Each structure stands twice: as structure tokens, then as C-alpha cells.
Amino acid sequence: MEKWASLDSDESEPPAQENSCPDPPDRDPNSKPPPAKPHIFATRSRTRLFGKGDSEEASPMDCPYEEGGLASCPIITVSSVVTLQRSVDGPTCLRQTSQDSVSTGVETPPRLYDRRSIFDAVAQSNCQELESLLSFLQKSKKRLTDSEFKDPETGKTCLLKAMLNLHNGQNDTIALLLDIARKTDSLKQFVNASYTDSYYKGQTALHIAIERRNMALVTLLVENGADVQAAANGDFFKKTKGRPGFYFGELPLSLAACTNQLAIVKFLLQNSWQPADISARDSVGNTVLHALVEVADNTADNTKFVTNMYNEILILGAKLHPTLKLEELTNKKGLTPLALAASSGKIGVLAYILQREIHEPECRHLSRKFTEWAYGPVHSSLYDLSCIDTCEKNSVLEVIAYSSSETPNRHDMLLVEPLNRLLQDKWDRFVKRIFYFNFFVYCLYMIIFTTAAYYRPVEGLPPYKLNNTVGDYFRVTGEILSVSGGVYFFFRGIQYFLQRRPSLKSLFVDSYSEILFFVQSLFMLVSVVLYFSHRKEYVASMVFSLAMGWTNMLYYTRGFQQMGIYAVMIEKMILRDLCRFMFVYLVFLFGFSTAVVTLIEDGKNNSLPVESPPHKCRGSACRPGNSYNSLYSTCLELFKFTIGMGDLEFTENYDFKAVFIILLLAYVILTYILLLNMLIALMGETVNKIAQESKNIWKLQRAITILDTEKSFLKCMRKAFRSGKLLQVGFTPDGKDDFRWCFRVDEVNWTTWNTNVGIINEDPGNCEGVKRTLSFSLRSGRVSGRNWKNFALVPLLRDASTRDRHSTQPEEVQLKHYTGSLKPEDAEVFKDSMAPGEK
């Protein structure tokens, strides 16, 4: 008894990680102990939240505090400790053995391990605590991948726990755990174990090592069989609006690329154990290039690292897989990385891809821009139109023009070359003439519609009989043409809404003109129905259609820059300032009208005698014969106050004159003085604010008109009017001729000179000794036309590409000061080059 008491006194202050509960000496060691004393301070239970319908707090990937304490964990025994097992809900009692029992020669029981003890050891990077783990697993025939050694809620293993608890970038237990897993024949399963909860589902140790930017651990894991194609597709790794998380493309390669770790990217692609597939896609079909576009945010630093990483991966992929066209792979939405950058408004990445020019001979086929010639600051560049022009599905022009109004940088992206010059080329060559012709036809249609409406019959009920007169024949012809135009606009509007399917917000922002044309056609069709229904109300619907028809004339101002910008300002002021003004004004009008109507009482003073002729009445004593005790009449009178034409004594049929005057004065102050002046101030501010924005919006509207006109052509006509020209710009990696549909843009750049530019033609404006004509203009920006008739470019491009293939030096023009003497062969070169100029 004294011995037990002494032991109890020694264990009165147990360590923080152990619970000691001494029993009395006369108690059976196997009996159930009394319940443990509860903690004085109640701990808040932490709930793991993974689903979208759960609380806003998301569970962390790792936490130093394990849930459930020791209640749900098996017992832990140490060789120098005798463990008394209790029930699952009770604590575990630990008692030290006496020196006599140790000296008796009784065999010391092996140490037992559970999830808690292993997790604590790896979190502290304590390898000594895991020395007996291998023997324990071998004797118990267990593995580290068994469910009892995993977190029951997240599926986290001790390896994942160790990866999340690095000390100075390393954890000594990781190599030990991998060695134990190898000796228990569970290495591959252990190293590829991932989270199983919905929030971090699929994340493996390799993902964590890459996220921790630890090259040594990445190498160690890949050497031990880590799956380089493991996909982390939990909710945290998805691009969900309004939820925290980080989308990187799910795959380890994409994670390394999106976190700017080029060394790990190269290792994953070039290691000898398990190279990553550079063309692998995630659950939404995005490749590593798509993922880079997704993480771009248009800031300077982010755009710089994304474009550099994009370029490195593209070149590395070309060297590893020469025939793979990585940039042409599409996701499940059918978008290439270029189209994805356009649809998401990543203007920095978009400009880089469109203007990418690689000078390395073995990777020059990756370029989308080829410098034809350069002279001083002037560069003549050939832009590859693949995935840009409307001849291909999901082209960049269509994606930008028809994208949602919420797309950032939507207007500015059309100013990036070659998009800006390409649209201008289409407008100058054929769209401009078609647009002006449509404008003329619409003006003629409105004149016919107006004439037919003005000379309509006024006697009798419709439909009216046709008299055998020239005037009636012209009138009926005009009516038929007017109705035909209404039917055309109706079906064109239906086609537009079915193809574009705009949202409610973009419907009033981007589809402003289409809505007006559609409403005009609806009024026309309603007028036709009322006309044949013997109702004279057809006139009301017809005049509304007529008024909207002339208003829609503003649509054709987009063909003229100054008028187009002015029309955009009117549209923006209507949608922004005027709509807000009308909402507040209608609230005031309705509120004060109901108050005035309630105050007015019908009486003889409120109307004129019947015998008084209205047209002879003058002054405030003359009032119309209707009663003002109606909301309609009162609203009309109050509206007159808004425009400064109201009369404070428009009626005298009230009992509280002071209240009546106060209501009218308050209405005048709030509407005529406050709201109208505020509207004028807001309109002036809007004009100043959107001056430059209006120009870009006008360019976007004109771009939509250009694409709509081009889409109305037959397929054969589209090819005939296609901008650019098919040219050979070099050779493909498999040795075939590399033909591209190119568009030439002449640029002036005062920062980039022709010292380090891969130039196709040595002589500016002179190809194979044939000079260009003086009709060449830097403003043309076109490949087709007379600029291409004066020289043969394809043979020269083929020769330039051949020189690149047989030469180890890249083609660069080096301007150096020459101090030596000329050799004979140099003289021959100069003589040949000067010969054309001397002729």
C-alpha cells in the first residue's frame, strides 16, 4: 500500500500529454476507474466543415490540436510502463514498475503505437519516438495506410502530417516513414495517399511538397513512386465564386507552374523515374497552359511571372515532344489557352501570346509573330491568324466581341495588335460598303413607313378597301413594305437572342440596339393584328413603332467615329443617370400625388359650369371640366411643376390650404430644384468620365457589326473576303513546310531596335532584288492587296528557314564599329548588295 501511495504522490503532476489516474492499492487493476474530473474551462468543439451548405468556416489542412482527445485512440504502452486498459470513454492509467519487477527477468512488452502518438512524433520531427514503429507494424501485421492510422474525417496520413510540419524546410521523419512503408510492402500506396474529405480531396504529399517549395522533398517523393498525375480536385482547389480557395489545375505540374517554380517544373517533366505528361488535363479539361492563364490577374508582377513560365513550358514541351501542339489543345469548353485569355479578360497574357516571337531556330515554329524586315524603329511584322480570325470556331475576335459585359478589359483587348489592325482591315475592305448600303436601305424603309402612316385612311374602321387609284396602290405598297420590315426585325431579334443568350445585365448593356429594334417590330406586328381585328387602336401601336424606328437610326452612327462616340454617351447616360433619376422621380411623383388626391374633395369649385366655353376662359379661374380627385389628373398637374409649368392654384377644392401649399412647395423643391439639377450634374460627370471609355465602346460596337456582317456571308464568300495571306514561315519540327495564314502589320517602335530581332528579309522593302512600289504605306496594315504583288516572299522565307536549320548561330543583325580592312570576298558581297541601287 505504501508503494502504491508513493507512486501516486510521484504522479500527482503528470506530463502535459499524459493522463494519470492512480487507483487505490486494494482495487482490482482491471476494474473500471471512476470518471475523470471535468476540465474547469470548457473547450469549444470544433466542427470540420467541407460541404457548400456548411458553415462559412472551412477546416484547416492541419492543426496542432487533435479532436476527440484520447477517448477515440487506442492505448499507448511504453516498455517501462505498465498500462491498465480502461473503457473507450475513460482515461488510461499509467504506473511505473518497481525496480524489483524489472530485475526479475520478466520480458518487457514492446511499445504500442496509435495514430495520435505517430502524428505527435512526426509533427515534432522526432525520429526516436518512431524507432520501434517498424517492429510494431511487422508483429501486428499492420501498415501505415490502415484506417486506424488515418484521420477519420480527412483521411490524412502520418506522411501528410509530416509534410505539413516542416522545420527549416525538412522533417527527418519523412525518410523514416518512407523506409518503414517500403519494408511493410506499402510504399506506393503510402506515398500516394491523399485527403478523402470533400474540401481537400485528392491532395497528396507531392502536392504539399510543391506548395512548400521544397525541391528535395519533391525529388524524394518522386524517387519513391509518387504519382505525378495525382489530381487534387477538392472544393478548395476549384474555382468557385464567393468561396476561398486556390485553383491551379489540380495536377502537380500545374501547381509548380502556377506557383512560379521553374526548377520543379523541369524536374517533373525530365526526371527518369516518372516524367509528368505535359498535355495532361484536369477535371475541366485545362492543361498546364490553361491553368497559368487562369491564375493571371493582370497585375504587373503576376503577368510577368505567368508569361515567363508560359514561355518556358512551351519551349520545354517543344524540345521534349517536338510534334505536340500544346497550345492548340482545348478544354471542355472548346477554348485554347489563347481563347481562354480572351474570354477571361487576361489582357497581359493575351498580348504576350499574340505577339510572341522566339528567335531560337529549333523553337521558332512556336512564334506567332515573325519580323519580316526592320529599319531603325520601323518593323514590318507578320502575325499568325490561327485561332484569331472568324474562320475558326471560338476565334479570339468572336470570344472578345460576344463575351459578357462583365469581362474585364473587354474594350481594351481589341486594341492589342494584330486585333486592332485586323478589324480595321475588314472594315476598310468590305464591311464599310455593306454597312453604308444597309444604312441607305433603312433610311429608305423609314421614309416609306412614315409616308404610309401619314397618308393612312381616317374614315371608317379597318381594314380599309382598296380603291383603284394610284395613291391607294402606293399606300398599300408602302404598308406591305413596312410590315415586311417589321417581320424581318422580329425574326432577326429572335435569332440574336437564341444565338447569344445574353444575361439580364448584359441584355441592357450590350444588346441595347437589338432590344430597340425588337420592340419596334413588336409594335408593328401588334398594329397589324389590331388592324385586321377592326380596331382603330392600331394607330397607337403604329405610331410607337414609327417613333422607335427613327430613334433606332442612332444604330447606324457607329459607322462614323464622332457620331458613334456621341451615341455611346447618350446610351450610357440613359442606362446610368436617367434610369436612376426616373426611379427616384417616380417615387416622389407617386407619393405626392397620393397625398394631394387624398386632400382634394370633389365640389363645384373644382370644375367649370357646363355653359362656359373652355376656349374663352382665361386665368386661374378657368379649369377643365374633369375632377382632380383622381390619381391620373393629379400626376399630370404635378408633372407640370417638374418642368416649370405648374400652377399652385390649379384647384381650390380643399379644406387645408396651408397643407396643400406645403405639399406642392416640397414637391417643387425636391423635383424641379433638386433632382433636375442633380441629373444635369451627373450627366456632366458621366461625359467627362467615359470620354475615353466611349471611344473604346464604340470600337467594340463596330467590331460586333463587322463580325455580324461577316457571319451573314456564305462560307465561300468568307474565304474570299478573308484577311491575310497563306505564307511559309519556316519548317515544322518534323521537317515539313510550315505554312501560316499571316497578316502584316507595320509598326514603329522607338524602344526595340533591329539589333536582336530575327529578321526574315535582309533588305527593308526589297525582296530578292525586286523593290516595292511607292504605294506602300505604313497605315495599310494588310497582307493581301497590292502590297503583296511586288515581291515573292515564300522562296525567301524558305531560304531563311533553311539557313536557320543548317546554322548554329541565330539570325541577328549586329551593328558593330568596324576598324579592320576588308577582305576580297567582303568586297564582292558589298558589290552585289550595291548593284541594285546603282541601276
Curated annotation (Swiss-Prot):
Which parts pass through the membrane?
434-455, 473-497, 511-532, 536-556, 560-598, 657-683
Q: Which reaction does it catalyse?
A: Ca(2+)(in) = Ca(2+)(out); Mg(2+)(in) = Mg(2+)(out); Na(+)(in) = Na(+)(out); K(+)(in) = K(+)(out)
Record PTM Phosphothreonine, positions in chain: T145, T371, T705
- Quote the record's binding site residues for resiniferatoxin: Y512, S513, T551, R558
Positions annotated to bind Na(+) 2: G644
Where does this chain carry the motif Selectivity filter?
Answer: 644-647
ANK repeat feature ranges? 111-139, 154-186, 204-229, 250-277, 286-322, 336-359, 394-416
What Gene Ontology molecular-function terms does this entry list? Answer: ATP binding; calcium channel activity; calmodulin binding; excitatory extracellular ligand-gated monoatomic ion channel activity; extracellular ligand-gated monoatomic ion channel activity; identical protein binding; intracellularly gated calcium channel activity; metal ion binding
Which positions does UniProt annotate with glycan attachment? N605
Binding residues annotated for Ca(2+), in chain numbering: D647
Which segments sit in the membrane without spanning it?
631-652
Reproduce the free-text note on domains from the UniProt record. Answer: The association domain (AD) is necessary for self-association.
Q: Which PANTHER family match?
A: TRANSIENT RECEPTOR POTENTIAL CATION CHANNEL SUBFAMILY V MEMBER 1 (PTHR10582:SF17), TRANSIENT RECEPTOR POTENTIAL ION CHANNEL PROTEIN (PTHR10582)
Q: What is the name listed in the Swiss-Prot or TrEMBL entry for this protein?
A: Transient receptor potential cation channel subfamily V member 1
Give the species: Mus musculus
The organism's lineage?
Eukaryota, Metazoa, Chordata, Craniata, Vertebrata
